[in-house]
């Protein structure tokens, strides 16, 4: 295993740990296991022996063959060999990533502070001596004799390594994929200073290589580095015979993976190609959900708790992080980790299925303008249910507790003898989030001089907790079991009903309820009354409940298609203090033109100054002035193209579209220009003449748009008016 460290003297050092020998397990008849052991020994350096490990579902010991692999590079291949050799045998721990497995075994994690005992080769330490071949280079590196962690995964006050950071991007709009056509010069930022590289004096790859050698960054943060920047620089360097030291590691090539389209819960999504480095870290801000949502501070937090490699953690889902946290606990408990999900759904009568296959409880909102409204939320409700009631895939309908308490509505049993793996994982995450919340309350939410951004760290942990519920029912989750998913939903429904009944018994009116939130109103109620209600609900349900906010007013909006029908998640709330809460409006949607989103937010800022319906009506006139100003800007041609960009996700390949929708037209324009598009990719376009008889004149892909085409003033004005309509919807009917 190759390790890269920053020493106390700031030296960067490459080390090899040859003591790491991962193992996997095989279950089957004794005679077959004996033959398998002989076959494995004939293929590779392995040590085989019978041992006992715990089965996740039975909770009992299982006799298995332990296969210890002397060369980690053969680990995955030997697991595949077992499949080919005897497909009836069951494998465990055989397809785990080696880096987390190393961390589990050595009790370390990425970015941790460690203490090492190192053996140095006779010709010196890394970097590798010039002129050495690859085989010699491997031996020339210092070897780890012992490693000990001097850090704690669950610490909140931790020190991060002093990483040297370089940022790279192309000139132009960051959100527009440069592969769609328009590419500017390469911009590189080091220590706050930006440099521009183009081909005017030397190849861009040559200039970038020089900066890499001069500044030797530990971390490169890019925009579109995975799919465009680094592949393009590598191609240019290869054609020109240039050496481009993207990697620090002298014996490893840059790792690439292909882009792919896939389906998830009925949505067509796209995962871009990746370019990962060895000896350096590369994070592509356009290809990292967690870096986009929580910046690098949130990414470092996830890396520490999941023990996933930094570059992998940046690009994978938070669900993978939860899975590896579950697997680490299983590993430490001596529990076998199934290679793939092996627990099928239990057979159910149709009546049972109808009862079980339901989500959270929703009480539709009362339409209208309401003053003096409070929002009460169960804190991390689904994770709290898992932790409080021990709901985990292996604990639901266990075989050891026939008299265990039953899940309401469903009658499922929950184990009383062993603590569930998922329950323990979420319990630790909840506790750490609470610690960060306490630190925020003591020192303020915003980071100060030398103080970490606890808000971003807490947000990163939230994303882990958000997905842990879904993974209990995910069809491919190793520790997934649909009955656990159904149990959590059933308990959540029961707790929300208890909360509703408690509120109504105390004279509060329920305006809206959604899974884990209640919007309540009571004439003359003060903040203390709502806090007491939350405490009463918490006492009755056993789940933590918080007063999220007291709102001066809330506007619950109907369906866009049917003005009399309420819909969940289309409303806006103005609190006594803090930010306006918005759901379902255009300014919350990723595909809305920036001009429209900005108009809505400006109008809301004015409306948020109102305290009741009468003052809201007065402020509405001021908000209309905002709308008129934006309409006039469009009319005068004063809107910039960046403000008018509309983004859409492709649901199919460009040539498979049958109808001339705006998305189809723009996609086909890009396709004809030579851009290769795949289902799930995002494209951007400008509306140029929505009513034209010629489809190509209706919209123009952003990277193909020319200034002389202009934009469709009438259509964009129509969109602005539609976006303003929610604010006027109840203006004539009055408050409730």
Language model region names:
Residues 3-5, 309-393, 397-398, 449-453, ...:
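DNA-dependent DNA polymerase catalytic subunits
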Residues 217-226, 511-512, 519:
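Short glycine-rich phosphate-binding loop at a beta-alpha junction
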Residues 178, 223-236, 385-386, 521-524, ...:
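A short acidic (Asp/Glu
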Residues 183, 190-191, 219-316, 323, ...:
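Metal-dependent phosphoesterase core characteristic of DEDDh/y 3'-5' exonuclease domains
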Residues 188-193, 471-490:
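Gly-rich Lys/Arg/Thr-decorated short loops/hinges at beta-loop-alpha junctions or inter-strand turns
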Residues 469-476, 508-517:
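Core alpha/beta catalytic barrel or barrel-like domain that forms the active/cofactor pocket
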Residues 1-215, 238-245, 295-297, 304-359, ...:
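DnaQ-like (DEDDh/DEDDy) 3′-5′ exonuclease domain used for proofreading
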